[in-house]
Structures are given as structure tokens and as C-alpha cells.
């Protein structure tokens, strides 16, 4: 039997759970009856026993796709429009973020698994002579399906410590991220930021710095994947902040039309009040809110201005929704040439440099958090950060990386000193 070219089958693990149907340019999601009896809604906006608006389906799927230049490379490879969500998902469906596998209706889940080894020498050669195409496309196949704009590829780290590409039923376990000429030392920046987050006891993805010749890279362990045996990867379903809010990817910033004068007042994108409100849908709302609070305050302390709606994710399972580890933490102040406006306002403040007791009190009130809780967590994080930054470290830095690290330390220490002075006023200041 030849499958319908306008129907995609959705699998979670070995279970076929739903169909996506394209009718007159609209996408429709329908759960299988067996899954409705035994499963769960994979997103709050793709409910089990209600009609699902096509707009919800379109937004959910678009948030599975890469963004920016990586998306442009993929549409050229597949000869598709970037607006053809159905076609792009069909092309990338074997290795989407989380646990979903999305395939044409006439195509079964692959039973075979193949590991395509990538040697250090091969990757170094690609990086030395790279453009976006030859970094993403290997053996005529795109090796990127995760969302985001940064240069990166999906890889498998096998039991022998070798890097490669998973094919067939073998999906990626790690993401390998690279820096560009525009963002020198970005790999070191993110490594330091993730290390500091761990020092502050935030739940973050595990990362390692790698070098391929003169090219640094960040190897990020996927928290939605775990290699069980040589050919078996256990996957865990998750959604990002945009999917949680039922928003398209371009609404990942609170000021979804930008911050120019005529549109700055439009704030329909993902925001901190929306995230804290969504925490009420999680298994443990109080714990989730405290974890998000620590993420927000840590981002303030290290100048991670670009903490947007696609840089936070939630696990979704039979037992409910829970916060996933944090990722993509970067000190943006190290790059003065880039935008330093906050992705999500603290209260009404988008200026990342103008964060004082007033803004933190406004943030607490706006998100319905006790000011005393915000002050307590801020003081705790400052203590952890300053201790970590003053300790001796063994990071095997090379060239000018040591100077970069010192500058990073100075910026964060100065921020900590300033906000520690402001901290006692958070509970008493009048708005």
C-alpha cells in the first residue's frame, strides 16, 4: 500500500501516537485511539480529547525546526520553502528535539542502526575550510535538526568515546557547538557560564570543551537522550518555552516586534510572568518557580541578556510536566557590539545594565513572588558565584583565553558587588 503523501505518522518510542494531516495548507493533529486510552497529551496545546486548532499544530511543529542560517541551508538542501513546515518536518522527522519521530505514512521506523564515525582530523578539516553548508551537510545529509541559530551539529558520543553521526534508529546523544568569527571565544564563554551555573547548583546540561586543531567546540550532553547500548538511545519528550505558551518561534522575545520606538510597547512574546504562571501547570509548582527564579537571577548576574523563550524547556510525560535542565547560558556583555536588551523584562525594565533594587522588586511583584524570596535567592547566588570565581581553576586555557577569562571574572564580580549592595532594599523599596 502506498502511503498518503499528505499524512505524517508521529511516534513516541515504539508507539505510533498521532497523525499530522495537510489539508488545504492547514495542518491537523489527531491522536490515535489507542494512545488516547493509554497515553498523554504531548503538549498542553495539543490536548487529547478536544479539537486542536491547526494554528496550534503549525506553531508546535515550527518550534522543532532550526532557525536563522542553519534553516536556510536546510531549505536549500531539501529544495523547500522555509514556510513549508510540513515538508521540513517530514525531512527532519527522524531526529527532532525530544522523543518524537515523525515519518511519512508509508515509512516504518528504521530497525537498523548505523554509527558513522567522524574523526578529529575530518572535523578539523571541515572547520578550517568551513561555510555553513559543509559544516551542516555531511555525506549529502543534513546533520542538524535541533532548534536555534548557532552553528552546531547533532552527534553521537559512543561508549568508546568516539564522535559520529547516528543513522537509522540511532539518534544523536550530544550537540557539538562552534563559534564564528563574529563571536570569538563564544565556546569558552558558554563553557564558563555553564560551569558557574553548576557552581550555583542550577540544574544545567553537562558540557565539555573540545579542540579540533585550532578550533574550540562545546560538546553538550543532551538531557533528552541517553545512550543505553551501542545501538539504543533512550529518548525523553520535552517542549520549549514557545511551545509551552503556544507561540511561534519568532515570539521567543517578549518584545516580539523588536524594541524600536514604534513597536517597543508590543509585548506579546514569551515573558517572565507567563513562565511563572506556566509553572502552575507543572508537577511541583513551588519548586519549579524557585528553579526559574534562580535561572532569572543567575542570568542577571552574568549578563545573559539573551535568555529567551526557546532557551528554557519542560519535560512532558505520563506523570505531568517538569522543568528541564538549563542550557545556552552566555555572558553577552563580553560582546559590546551586540544588543544588550533583555529578552524578557524584569518588571518593565529591558535595559540589562539598569538592574537595581527597584527593578528586582518590580519583577517580584509582577511575577507574584515574595520579595523576600527574591532577595534570599539573589544573596545566595552571589555568594556561590563569587566563591567560584575566586577559586583556582584548571581549564587548560590557551593563547588569549586566559585574558578573556579574567575579563569575564571582572565583569561578573563587579555585577555581584553592585547587586549585593542593592539586595537589602528589595523588600522595602516602594514602587
What is each stretch, according to the model?
Residues 1-431:
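Phosphate/dinucleotide-binding and metal-coordinating scaffold of catalytic cores
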